[in-house]
Amino acid sequence: MITWHDLYTVLTAVIPLYVAMILAYGSVRWWKIFSPDQCSGINRFVAIFAVPLLSFHFISSNNPYAMNLRFIAADTLQKLIMLTLLIIWANFTRSGSLEWSITIFSLSTLPNTLVMGIPLLIAMYGEYSGSLMVQIVVLQCIIWYTLLLFLFEYRGAKILIMEQFPETGASIVSFKVESDVVSLDGHDFLETDAQIGDDGKLHVTVRKSNASRRSFYGGGGTNMTPRPSNLTGAEIYSLNTTPRGSNFNHSDFYSMMGFPGGRLSNFGPADMYSVQSSRGPTPRPSNFEESCAMASSPRFGYYPGGAPGSYPAPNPEFSTGNKTGSKAPKENHHHVGKSNSNDAKELHMFVWGSNGSPVSDRAGLQVDNGANEQVGKSDQGGAKEIRMLISDHTQNGENKAGPMNGDYGGEEESERVKEVPNGLHKLRCNSTAELNPKEAIETGETVPVKHMPPASVMTRLILIMVWRKLIRNPNTYSSLIGLIWALVAFRWDVAMPKIIQQSISILSDAGLGMAMFSLGLFMALQPKLIACGNSTATFAMAVRFFTGPAVMAVAAMAIGLRGDLLRVAIVQAALPQGIVPFVFAKEYNVHPAILSTGVIFGMLIALPITLVYYILLGL
């Protein structure tokens, strides 16, 4: 039976963690002590030094020869059960998807064991439960986070191959990834170079593109500073520094537009860009061609852009997907006149001599490298046509797009999305592209099967990318070195030198509080605590605090755990969401809003929920 003294002991261990988190939150939101840049520096210190040294401290001081194999087996079985069910759901049901499988797996099986689990379980069930939590931390860092990274890289590789080689993916027999490419997470603008070998198979080289990506609608990296745009309904996020290899500059652009004095402060979209609105039945004719005529520009028309969140257009030498591209100029006016379900604005411009110009294809901004071939030869060498749609935002930040896909072009856009390889879609709660041909299934259309390279080729590519990510992660080194030292120290009874031990201890002692402080800073910097909507947040919390513990209870009883071991296993599964899965979700843009809500809101409600589990299991 749980006594009031037991509850007080638990609160004594956990409340100080929340005090650190609340202080950090108030320092940013209420007292304005820290700026976003200062918060970034604190988070950097926590990620590189505090948390890795905290992991090393716990792992190196835990006896690996006294590990409870049945407890580890129960934890492993829980994750394998969830993984198996999600794989079946993703591959054999219409509603399944790889993105949601990864998200649900993260929510249900990867709690915040290091920061919350160790102090909470020690207060509840004694020092031995703390040793069990350290064993879970070791498995998480070495096995399960690596598996999660493997799934994210598999998704990135699948998108890359489907978009670059939609028809010839099965013919790829090798990938060579240049050393500066560290991930397929979509943040780097990648390009592929395919060569046909003597055997008729494709040998692909993946490298970074010279063009830097510009991201729209908040889909960019952490270095992007939001600035309001005077383009109607658009919020443009621009990098502070000029991208590498870019010879595009704004002075040349505005001079080309006919403004010798540079950028004017009071220009409007109609005066500068000749934005055509699709709101009316007949769009106003553009005067952009008249302005460009003074610069001897070639003729051009609007062609539907690529899918948001996509890689560069497929290589025409190895894909037959460009057959529909020749119809684009004829469909231009039909597209504009009919697409009246949203407030999309069209923007077209030419940029001369901008081989490395910062262009985003994630939000529909696309550079037509072959524009001169399509509209006739021009004496303006190196001209690139930039085409994009800018849609107005509603008050809550969502575009006025079609009811299901949230893209930029309404009904016509939904028809164009069907032509994207394997029916890529955008989710409503974030800008993640799904890999399932949902529209084709709903409409009963038949879509061509997109063949993937052999499993051995895909596995080698993914392992290369996972390895490059792991060797750049400080937690990888701290976990492995801590485990190796524990194996040596407890096998031959070797003590760590006092100087090294005290040097590690002085930083690791601050790790727990700094980790919670960093989490509070993260909460304060978010515009909303619930970023993905109430219904989605409710679903995420149900998966985190009910599905995970339920599956763990089944797995633990199947292994034969009883008594306190069973209680520790269930309470451990009901801890708040782990931070590392959220970091991965943000890097790969797979439901980051859901994982953010799981971390923030889950931390707020975790204490009463775990106390309820503690009381019920103690009856």
From Swiss-Prot:
Residue ranges, annotated region (Disordered): 306-340, 393-413
Extracellular topological segments: 1-7, 60-71, 123-131, 501-503, 560-564
Any single Pfam family the record assigns to this protein: Mem_trans
Keywords: Auxin signaling pathway, Cell membrane, Membrane, Phosphoprotein, Transmembrane, Transmembrane helix, Transport
Entry's induction text: Down-regulated by endoplasmic reticulum stress treatment.
Membrane topology: Multi-pass membrane protein
UniProt record similarity statement: Belongs to the auxin efflux carrier (TC 2.A.69.1) family.
Name this polypeptide is given: Auxin efflux carrier component 7
Source species of the chain: Arabidopsis thaliana (Mouse-ear cress)
UniProt lineage: Eukaryota, Viridiplantae, Streptophyta, Embryophyta, Tracheophyta
